[in-house]
Structure formats: C-alpha cells, structure tokens
Amino acid sequence: MKALILVGGFGTRLRPLTLSFPKPLVDFANKPMILHQIEALKEVGVTEVVLAINYRPEVMLNFLKDFEDKLGITITCSQETEPLGTAGPLALARDKLVDGSGEPFFVLNSDVISEYPFAELIKFHKNHGGEATIMVTKVDEPSKYGVVVMEEATGMVEKFVEKPKIFVGNKINAGIYLLNPSVLDRIELKPTSIEKEVFPRISADAKLFAMVLPGFWMDVGQPRDYITGLRLYLDSLRKRSANRLATGAHIVGNVLVHESAKIGEGCLIGPDVAIGPGCVVEDGVRLSRCTVMRGVRIKKHACISNSIIGWHSTVGQWARIENMTILGEDVHVGDEVYTNGGVILPHKEIKSSILKPEIVM
C-alpha cells in the first residue's frame, strides 16, 4: 500500500519552532510529528510514503533518509510550485500513488495526532465498499468546525455543514482518509479543496463513508493544541504501553523521559511532560504540562508549566516560565527571570522578565 501525507507550507501557527525545522519535523513526545504517522503506516503494510510539500523538501528528505532504512519504507516528495490546497497535491502525485494494483491509498494531514487505527480503517473501507472512507471524530463544540452528517447505521456520509448555527451533529473530519485510485479521476491539477469540492461530489454519488475514530484526536498545529495533544497522547500511552512512561517518587502523572536525559535530585516532574534526548534537568526543578526538547538544560529550582522549550535552550536558576511561553531553538533565559507567556524567537537571550505575553524578536 501507499500513503500521501499533506505536509503543506510554512507552519506559521507553530512559530518559533518552525523557524528551525519544517513543522512535520518538530518534536512531539520526543520524536518528529511525522514519524508517529510513518511508523503507524508501516505497521499496516504501507511500503511507500509520499510527502506533498511546498517548503524545504530537501530538509525533510535528508532528515528522513535514516528512517527509510530503519523502517524499510520508501519516502519520496511531491513538490508543489504553487499552493494546491488539500486535493490538488493528490493530482500532482498521481503517478506516485497509482501502481495498477487497484489498492486504496491513505491520505493524512501531517498535523493530526491520534492512535492511528489504520487496520480498522482498512477493514471498514473494504466492508462498506465505498470509493472513499474518511475518519471522523466527535467534538464538544461542533459549531467551530465543518460537521460531517452521516447515517449512523451505515456510515454513509449525507452532507457537510460548515460551522452550523444549529446542531446537526458532533462529528468532524479527522484528516485521515482511505481512497480508491478512482478518486484521482475526480481531481484536476489546480488549487482544490478535498473537503469542500471532492468529498461532497463522492457523497452525492453515495460512495463516501465515515468511520468514527476510536480513542483520542488532536490537530497539534498550534501551541495550545500541541500542549493538549501531548496530554491526550500520554493518556493513551498509559493505556497502551505504560512501561514507556517514567516512574519514581519525583514523577507525578504521565511523564515521558528519553533514556539519555538526566534528572537531578529533588525534582518534581509532571503531569503531562515530555523530556527529550540529551536534556539536563538540575536539582529542585518543577515541570508540568510542558515539552522540553532535545539538548535543553534547565538549571536548579526553575519552574516551567504550560510551555514549550525549544531545542538546545537554557533556563536559568529560579527562573519561572508559564502561560504558554514558547522558546525557539537556542534561547537562553537568565536566572530568576519570569515569563508570563509569549513567543521567543531562536537564538535570543532573555535577561529581564516578560510580564505580559509578547513576541521577542
């Protein structure tokens, strides 16, 4: 089988992290976001992954080349010269996706984190005999999204309602699809929306089905959702592979610590924390609801919550970082500095406190 991942462009919503790496290569739970997807695809027999991309394809391919060998999977790029929406990239990559076997192929949005129940999706798609199957997820506030209205008994999609004023359902598109090659005949090589143009036409022919996604789901394309997504991911990991989570008197709740990280004495870590490779957490540090990326040093008695600490940054002694502070790569926060939210661009030094959320350039 084959898969296409819609990588897209500049990842502006996740800056300053995407100033250093393309968004799919930003670490999530101690590995690049896109690697979570590629590993799950490999498990169900996908042998080739096509990345639909219009920004820095050489960075993506160079980084993923090691994983090609480790996973035994082929990774290629289909590069757009102009933005083609969410359907145009499928037409552009047609020759890479169609091999004459007639097998369906996966399409994924690169921002989506879930348990990736691809085996169940394959079974559902074959059993229902549709041309396309989309995964949907239930949300508490459907008025913020485009709602998928479907027959509960059959899974057949009836219509799509964009940001409904009245309640029509609570299921939204989860950004995970399984499509027959014939879907490509419906798509022209031009900027096109698969959600607003292609799927409604398939639905009108009674050939579009929806499978309700089991487990958690989150689009982690912006910082607040990234933090929420980490909590949901760690909750899921507790149920599936609890042995991968850290344990000890200094651990509270779900915490993921890379084996090469070093944790000092008297720390309190958790809940909902990921500490990446090569990190050094000195004595007396308090961490909660945060991600600490590769190569970070957190000095004695610092406190970090609801924040993301970018690669190779340093947080000084007794510093306090909270309220959705996002440090880019190689940021150095001084001793006793307080940051109350904000975005700090890469390679900056913060010597004085930030009392209101701001962008530090």
UniProtKB/Swiss-Prot annotation:
Cited PROSITE patterns: HEXAPEP_TRANSFERASES (PS00101)
Keyword Membrane: no
EC number(s) on file: 2.7.7.13
Residues where GDP-alpha-D-mannose binds: 6-7, 85, 109, 111, 146, 173
GO molecular function: GTP binding; mannose-1-phosphate guanylyltransferase (GTP) activity
The entry's keywords: GTP-binding, Nucleotide-binding, Nucleotidyltransferase, Transferase
Pfam families hit by this protein: GMPPB_C (PF25087), NTP_transferase (PF00483)
Residue numbers binding diphosphate: 9, 11-13, 23
Enzyme class: transferase
An annotated GO cellular component: cytoplasm
GO biological process: GDP-mannose biosynthetic process; protein glycosylation
Residue intervals passing through the bilayer: none
Catalytic reaction(s) noted: alpha-D-mannose 1-phosphate + GTP + H(+) = GDP-alpha-D-mannose + diphosphate
Role, per record: Catalyzes a reaction of the Smirnoff-Wheeler pathway, the major route to ascorbate biosynthesis in plants.
Protein name: Probable mannose-1-phosphate guanylyltransferase 3
